[in-house]
Amino acid sequence: MTHKFSYSLCFIISVCLLSGASSAQQLEIYIPENSTNVPEEKETDNILARCLATGLEEYCAGISLNANGTTLEANGPSDITLETFIIDLNDDTGTAKPRVTVKTDTGGAADTGQQTGSIDVKSAGIEIEFDFNSHKLRADQLDKVSVIATAFADDINAGKLYAIVGHTDGKGSDTYNCKLSAKRAATITSALLVGGAKAYLQPIGVGEVLLKDAANPANAQNRRVSFLKLDDNAETVINAFKALCD
């Protein structure tokens, strides 16, 4: 299949924003993947690379990124948050934008399968910090981004296609938030590519359309970037996410 879009990077990251001089707010960036629920054939000793390549809880549970960016397996809470984005292919609302929803994976019983006429895309989340209203990568986040780049440089991710989807909270105008989310996704994408990522990466901004906490639009958890691992339906998924800010 010939893809008629440019490739860029994809992974999930939670981003913390600084509001003023002293208070820090977190923004999450996620790395989603297609919900095939089939582990990759390749093996790797890089546990973060394995998590990003599969998006499965069994591979992502208990992963911890310590202060210097080292990846560790632990028995405590994971630094990876899993979400699923659901794209409705039978949307008959008559609007130009597709119907895309998001749900947090709670770690309970696995879904029996996606509904007919929809595409499910999984994501994995990692905390990355940005200053308030900024898309510039902070110096204190470079080590962590370097570790993520190494995971994308692993052979298990070589040649795979990922979309990086940037999100904002519900504050500000739709137009501004769409632009800011796109810039943050592009910043992370560039950093991963410079760090040696072997995957094809596509940055996309969706602004405030897909709030993680819709009941609290200003919640810092809504400010995130999602990384989606794409397969045969890549063009459909990318076009659906791009249309949310068109």
Would you name each region that the model predicts?
Residues 41, 78, 134-142, 178-181, ...:
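Solvent-exposed, acidic/flexible segments
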Residues 130-165, 189-200, 227, 235-241:
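Periplasmic peptidoglycan-binding/anchoring modules of Gram-negative envelope and division proteins
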